[in-house]
From Swiss-Prot:
Disease: Retinitis pigmentosa 3: An X-linked retinal dystrophy belonging to the group of pigmentary retinopathies. Retinitis pigmentosa is characterized by retinal pigment deposits visible on fundus examination and primary loss of rod photoreceptor cells followed by secondary loss of cone photoreceptors. Patients typically have night vision blindness and loss of midperipheral visual field. As their condition progresses, they lose their far peripheral visual field and eventually central vision as well.
Source superkingdom: Eukaryota
Lipid linkage positions (S-geranylgeranyl cysteine): C1017
Outcome recorded upon mutating T99N: In RP3; no change in GEF activity towards RAB8A
Name used for this protein in its record: X-linked retinitis pigmentosa GTPase regulator
Main location: cytoplasm
Organs and tissues of expression: Heart, brain, placenta, lung, liver, muscle, kidney, retina, pancreas and fetal retinal pigment epithelium. Isoform 3 is found only in the retina. Colocalizes with RPGRIP1 in the outer segment of rod photoreceptors and cone outer segments.
Record annotation: effect of changing G173R: In RP3 and RPSRDF
Annotated phenotype, changing G215V: In RP3; reduces interaction with PDE6D
Pfam families in UniProt: WD40_RLD
Compartments where found: Cytoplasm, Cytoskeleton, Flagellum axoneme; Golgi apparatus; Cell projection, Cilium
Region feature Disordered, mapped onto this chain: 609-776, 790-906, 989-1020
Length: 1020
């Protein structure tokens, strides 16, 4: 035997795959000098090779002495059993822990485990050297040996079958005995031509082509109807195979049958060992493997959970459990295969022998003439996977195949080869016509290596067929079903067109240079979204305590209104990630959190991750840049950043639907211009409303929902909206700073006048407080991030804070996104105005929001003015507010003095807005507050839907109401600004209060509002 330092001989080599001990989990090969293998056998963890010179080589595990080398130490190098040299070994069979050998002289030897008498030596003592079975003499010319878990079988040339060992399940065909220690003949009145022992069942073929099975009846591996399973301890004819059977192979829980024209499989196929695809994991009825009907199979072999087939031209197909690489499909493909997959590693070889074991496979193959040069598996592996995966399985479609067939390394390599085509291939739905398969193996890339024989031609034709296969074909079918269930698959986001089932949307950036992945939040109306945003701004000011109540009420409502909590949770996470992508530049890191639908911990972690990534710094910097650079520039830059990061996201899960949604999101951006494209652009018009809601919700979540949304995903919706609103309020102030840059985005927003005013106010505020505010907004973002990260720490609503924290993270991310995009900044400004408005009349904001929907533009104009004031105040407030936001709940009095001043300004504006809103709706500010308090109380008891609906209405309407309130806030005293946080909560509550009773709880709210106010003051 020679190691592979030298060129492989023309006679071929033995290749090992999986846990063979010769090369653990890696392909290995060896060959014999002046000798060739003629027989291979694999047990559970050991292997045997018989050469043409009648020598026996053993390697693998040896804990039972199954190698017959006189010890129990494992052998990693094929070792000749010298004791049998004189005997001229002819055949060998490896069971789970024992080995059988027959010699030309007619003797049969056994070694290894013997707990059930499977050695046939008349006792149950194990052996570590080969002992002759005295039962067999020269009269018994052995034709075939087979060994199972604790069973043994020998078939003579005259068709007599002898079996011994364990019979607890009838696996040796003896009806009334539990086990036998010496060979016993099994007769059915016909000579036997083929025998196979599985782990706990057996089968044989008669000379007239009939198949008989016996042994353990579970999982359909006997291929018998239920009425015949009662006699499973004796051989039963499988009548459902109409053709003449040639060979049979038994695995752990499945059986493979070779007939003259087809290959049948039955039993359990959870790993794909049946080769019947991903939709059939178990069958007691023999099924034909349709994918290889065009191939002439000459040999079959079964391992515990995998199967190998050899064609008449020397090609090999494998399928089943791919762990440890035992399918021989390459170093990078350890996934399960549910249909026969061509082993492209052997395209330049003629496969002659194969044996499958428990966790490995051994193959003997000889190279085509003129190709006997050294072969590196690494070179072959790259092509192997593609070729194997793109075999001409016409019956399979990309939808039927899972995308997990490719290993991580293979996916990386494919991305390196063609990242665009690879990512698109994995994420986009199949495209009619040819596919740009970066990883597929073109015949010219793989087959030119093949010899010029008919084999090459046949292989080429097969590959030609394979190429039309869509890349999805590579996916495991088993994974396929899971993917269908998960749909996010992380890799295929939103293949479904059902909005209710969508959690993320891919959208092109406004520049259409990059794709953006954002969570999909479903809402009925943009107005509702706007209202939600406003409510979120208000709730943001509210402490997490009231917000938690609101979030609790809203959780149920949110779940009802929004299709699922997971969607909302995922969306916030997505927004956060999008934010970090743009702000922090961590696209991939954020993407992972986005994929997570767990609204609670995930969002928090995601947002924290953004902070860790430097989101705060980036946000502050971007805020400065945006405030200094103008909204349009910032918007474009943010969009470019978003587009780049989104492009990565798109590569991860690129989708046309996402792009369309992004466009629609862009349409949304006029209203949410303050929000960056990250969260918004990727969403469809359908999702615009949802996105807006989410953004508003996210903003609210950042402040309030950190505490409460963590508790409940449903509360996440409302809590998210509330905290988002609060975030919008507190965050808007920094955004207002950004709004100087976001003014352009405000121009994009429908409320252009308001945006302009907001811009002016923001610009003024930015001029005055640009650096401090930027730092404040930085702090705000930082605090938000910290706060999100702190959500687990604060845990006012421990769990609620988790879910809401996630929402808050997303909200912050959305707000930061708003910063990135000037048009979206408008929304932030509106939210900041909402903070002031909410601070003064949370209730009015709600009631007025309904009216404001019609008065949005006018109110927006007023809003702009009030925003200018409010923004200025907010700008001063944001830093304090954000700083408080970090520790806002913990340190409410840190910046109370400054906050009070800022609040006074904001309160004036907010009161003006509130009054203005009150006038449209005919409600008093106090009524709004009381209603918000009432709503808070009710929200604890009322479903989340009501809360969310009110919030939604409030968000869009809130913007105009904010404008109105700003008008009145200028006229009204500052004190109600103190209740901004309370009013935020109240406002979100007021949504329900508007539905319930706007004025009942407002009187009760003031104390809480006072606390909120103090906190909001500190925040400001």
């Amino acid at each position: 035997m020679r190691e592979p330092e030298e060129l492989m001989p023309d006679s071929g080599a033995v290749f090992t795959f999986g846990k063979s001990k010769f090369a653990e989990n890696n392909p290995g090969k060896f060959w014999f000098k002046n000798d060739v293998p003629v027989h291979l056998s694999c047990g559970d963890e050991h292997s045997a090779v018989v050469t043409g010179n009648n020598k026996l080589y053993m390697f693998g595990s040896n804990n039972w002495g199954q190698l017959g080398l006189g010890s129990k130490s494992a052998i990693s190098k094929p070792t000749c059993v010298k004791a049998l040299k004189p005997e001229k070994v002819k055949l060998a069979a490896c069971g789970r822990n024992h080995t059988l050998v027959s010699t030309e002289g007619g003797n049969v030897y056994a070694t290894g485990g013997n707990n059930e008498g499977q050695l046939g030596l008349g006792d149950t003592e194990e052996r570590n050297t080969f002992h002759v079975i005295s039962f067999f003499t020269s009269e018994h010319k052995i034709k075939q040996l087979s060994a199972g878990s604790n069973t043994s079988a020998a078939l003579t040339e005259d068709g007599r079958l002898f079996m011994w060992g364990d019979n607890s399940e009838g696996q040796i065909g003896l009806k009334n005995v539990s086990n036998v220690c010496v060979p016993q003949q099994v007769t059915i009145g016909k000579p036997v031509s083929w025998i196979s022992c599985g782990y706990y069942h057996s089968a044989f073929v008669t000379t007239d082509g009939e198949l008989y099975v016996f042994g353990e009846p579970e999982n359909g591996k006997l291929g018998l109807p239920n009425q015949l399973l009662g006699n499973h301890r004796t051989p039963q004819l499988v009548s459902e195979i109409p053709e003449k059977v040639i060979q049979v192979a038994c695995g752990g829980e499945h059986t493979v049958v070779l007939t003259e024209n087809a290959v049948y499989t039955f039993g359990l196929g959870q790993f794909g060992q049946l080769g019947l695809g991903t939709f059939l994991f178990e069958t007691s009825e023999p099924k034909v493997i349709e994918n290889i009907r065009d191939q002439t199979i000459s040999y079959i072999s079964c391992g515990e959970n995998h199967t190998a087939l050899i064609t008449d031209i020397g090609l090999m197909y494998t399928f089943g459990d791919g762990r440890h690489g035992k399918l021989g499909l390459g170093l990078e493909n350890f996934t399960n295969h549910f249909i026969p997959t061509l082993c492209s590693n052997f395209l330049r070889f003629i496969v002659k022998l194969v044996a499958c074991g428990g966790c490995h496979m051994v193959v003997f193959a000889a190279p085509h003439r003129g190709v006997a040069k050294e072969i590196e598996f690494d070179e072959i592996n790259d092509t192997c996977l593609s070729v194997a995966t793109f075999l001409p399985y016409s019956s399979l479609t990309s939808g039927n195949v899972l995308q997990r067939t490719l290993s991580a390394r293979m996916r990386r390599r494919e991305r390196e080869r063609s990242p665009d085509s690879f990512s698109m291939r994995r994420t986009l739905p199949p495209i009619e016509g040819t596919l740009g398969l970066s990883a597929c193996f073109l015949p010219n890339s793989v087959f030119p290596r093949c010899s010029e024989r008919n084999l090459q031609e046949s292989v080429l034709s097969e590959q030609d067929l394979m190429q039309p296969e869509e890349p999805d074909y590579l996916l495991d079918e088993m994974t396929k079903e899971a993917e269908i269930d998960n749909s996010s698959t992380v890799e295929s986001l939103g293949e479904t067109t059902d909005i209710l089932n969508m959690t993320h949307i891919m959208s092109l950036n406004s520049n259409e240079k990059s794709l953006k992945l954002s969570p999909v939040q479903k809402q009925k109306k943009q107005q509702t979204i706007g209202e939600l945003t406003q409510d979120t701004a208000l709730t943001e000011n509210d402490d997490s305590d009231e917000y938690e109540e609101m979030s609790e009420m809203k959780e149920g409502k949110a779940c009802k209104q929004h299709v699922s909590q997971g969607i909302f949770m995922t969306q916030p996470a997505t927004t956060i990630e999008a934010f970090s992508d743009e702000e922090v530049g961590n696209d991939t890191g954020q993407v992972g959190p986005q994929a997570d639908t767990d609204g609670e911990g995930l969002q928090k972690e995601v947002y924290r991750h953004e902070n860790n990534n430097g989101v705060d710094q980036l946000d502050a910097k971007e805020i400065e840049k945006e405030s200094d650079g103008g909204h349009s520039q910032k918007e474009s830059e943010a969009e470019e950043i978003d587009s780049e990061k989104e492009t990565k996201l798109a590569e991860i899960a690129g989708m046309k639907d996402l792009r369309e949604r992004e466009k629609s999101t862009k349409k949304m951006s006029p209203f949410f211009g303050n929000l960056p494209d990250r969260g918004m652009n990727t969403e469809s018009e359908e999702n615009k409303d949802f996105v807006k809601k989410r953004e508003s919700c996210k903003q609210d979540v950042i402040f309030d929902s950190e505490r409460e949304s963590v508790e409940k995903p449903d509360s996440y919706m409302e809590g998210a909206s509330e905290s988002q609103q609060g975030i919008a309020d507190g965050f808007q102030q920094p955004e207002a700073i950004e709004f100087s840059s976001g003014e352009k985005e405000d121009d994009e927003v429908e409320t252009d006048q308001n945006i302009r005013y907001g811009r002016k106010l923001i610009e003024q505020g930015n001029e005055k407080e640009t650096k401090p505010i930027i730092s404040k907004s930085m702090a705000k973002y930082d605090f938000k991030c910290d706060r999100l990260s702190e959500i687990p720490e604060e845990k006012e609503g421990a769990e609620d804070s988790k879910g809401n924290g996630i929402e808050e993270q997303e909200v912050e991310a959305n707000e930061e996104n708003v910063k990135v995009h000037g048009g979206r900044k408008e929304k932030t400004e509106i939210l900041s105005d909402d903070l002031t408005d909410k601070a003064e009349d949370h209730e009015f904001s709600k009631t007025e929001e309904l009216k404001l929907e019609d008065v949005d533009e006018e109110i927006n104009a007023e809003n702009v003015e009030s925003k200018k004031k409010t923004v200025g105040d907010d700008e001063s407030v944001p830093t304090g507010y954000h700083s408080k936001t970090e520790g806002a709940e913990r340190t409410n009095d840190d910046s109370s003095a400054e906050t009070i001043e800022k609040k006074e300004k904001a309160n004036l504006e907010e009161r003006a807005i509130c009054e203005y809103n009150e006038n449209p709706k005919g409600y008093m500010l106090d009524d709004a507050d009381s209603s918000s308090l009432e709503i808070l109380e009710n929200s604890e008891t009322t479903p989340s839907k009501d809360m969310k609906k009110t919030k939604k209405i409030f968000l869009f309407k809130r913007v105009p109401s904010i404008n109105q309130k700003i008008v009145k806030n200028n006229n009204e005293p500052l004190p109600e600004i103190k209740s901004i946080g309370d009013q935020i909560i109240l406002k979100s509550d007021n949504k329900d209060a508007d539905q319930n009773h706007m004025s009942q709880n407002h009187q009760n709210i003031p104390p809480t509002n006072t606390e909120r106010r103090s906190k909001s003051c500190t925040i400001l």
